[in-house]
């Protein structure tokens, strides 16, 4: 087993693979049980009066828990180390993830899902922080992007696996949450605790004010981006039903196309970023997602909805990598996990808040579902304004760089 504290080891593909697979556990937590919600509702409807309202929270509860617990997860990782907290997160993930197999009370299942979200917060915070700890800036960018791609691929895979595993009983997919136990030996043997003191002695000094600004900008961008992204994820089925599309296969196919477009965007991100810079990519991704929302709200037919999925998904593929990279470049090692924890909290807070925000906007516009299209259009307009602001930032940075070259 590697030493607990290692200042000389060099991270490579093996460490990258372990971290990427561990990161993908966070998406598995939600997508694997989504196909089971109708069966769970049917079982508990007879004994739980609020089943129709509570069952959907089985998907939303982990996101809320991550949003609330991720900052504390960052503090724990900075205080006690990334590797110990990652191991703890994997063990708790398996424990609380599989707990619903033996629980017969819906409210206790929701409690288990909240605790499960806390485990996810530990895993996501530690994995992202380790990428920044192990690799220098250029390689850091590459592994952050691979992390996003792996999460997308594994999420799509387990969406199908969860549906197949639940054909007999809705409880069966929860047994798959024990799989992270197989990763524990790899984490123990192939990952090590980075020597943050040595890194600090060689790090460039970034003014605290600049670090705080970068953190605030990253958190704002990921929150707005995730709200926009999840408008499509959550509201597309309702829009399709309003357009007369009720086939679950067609609705699922639209979600699959969005995932595929997101993967394409993630793969294209390094090339696009090299061409137009971070600010330019921020403007592009927000503009793509805003256009996707507009097309979705105005779509008269299923094929046009698919166009919206492509636009939104492509922009979403840039989001996490482009929002997190500037932050990971400036966070000092002793505060890195706390910064990543705050970023992770805003990411999942955006997911949780998205349907609430759209519902609130729709209320004075005719309520749900009649005011849904207008609410989506209004949020698209706000997103486009943020995109224009980033475009101005990019143009200003370009002029400043041109001036420096001339002088």
Regions inferred by a protein language model and the residue ranges of each:
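Extracellular/periplasmic helix-loop-helix junction of adjacent transmembrane segments
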Residues: 37-67
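Symmetry-related core transmembrane helices of the 12-TM Major Facilitator Superfamily/SLC fold
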Residues: 173-189, 373-392
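Helix-to-loop junctions at the C-terminal end of transmembrane segments
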Residues: 68-81, 265-278, 362
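Helix-loop-helix hairpin linking two adjacent transmembrane segments in secondary transporters
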Residues: 137-138, 146-192
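Extracytoplasmic gate region of multi-pass secondary transporters
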Residues: 214-256
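Conserved MFS/SLC helix-loop-helix module at the cytosolic interface between two early adjacent transmembrane helices
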Residues: 67-106
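Central cavity-lining transmembrane alpha-helices of secondary-active solute carriers
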Residues: 57-73, 256-268
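Cytoplasmic helix-loop-helix junction between adjacent transmembrane helices
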Residues: 106, 112-151
